[in-house]
Amino acid sequence: MKSDKLLGNRGLSIKKNSTDINLKGFSGYELKHSKEIDDEITRIGPGTKAGEYFRRYWHPIFISSELGDLPVAIKILGEELVLFRDQSLQLGLVHKHCPHRQASLEFGICQKTGISCCYHGWHFDVDGSILEVPGQPEHTQDFIKQKVRLGAYPTHEFKGLIFAYLGPIEKKPEFPNYDSLDFDGMEMVPYKAPFDCNWLQVLDAIV
């Protein structure tokens, strides 16, 4: 908001949406309306401009030591996802809901390879391909395996953090290994600091 000159009686005239308002004491009503949101840079869900930009890079999504034997539901760039480590210690990051009956894979079972749904037991590899479809007629299983996929994203572990790439697979960049992250005699210790706000507000606060 653009401030004009100070007025008497402890008031302030402020231009808001091309309308002058006079703020004095008890101005809760005048101030309750938040500033318009710049959708172009604040919205980061699938299909948004900022979201598509962010999806061309690797992002830290979880601390490795905090991922146990059970799948974990997380939300990254506006997407509901499930992160897990199978019994062969492979990482998987997949869409939250099974493509069969939309059951949450947060309650899935980590297998030797991949994860299986707790509802009907459909079994998926870490890349989203189907390994088993129990309960389906034998003559339909090959067709289902060819035509149905669970959405999945590449992951990478580095310095105690799990990173993910959520963009088009053909545009996936190499994972960046910066010299500044590898000092002799120093150990990186990952940590997290949750902020209940938009990413842009965090950036404004630290720049």
Where are these regions (language model features)?
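Rieske [2Fe-2S] iron-sulfur-binding subdomain
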Residues: 1-91, 111, 125-207
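Local cysteine-cluster metal-coordination motifs and their immediate loop/turn environment
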Residues: 93-107, 112-123
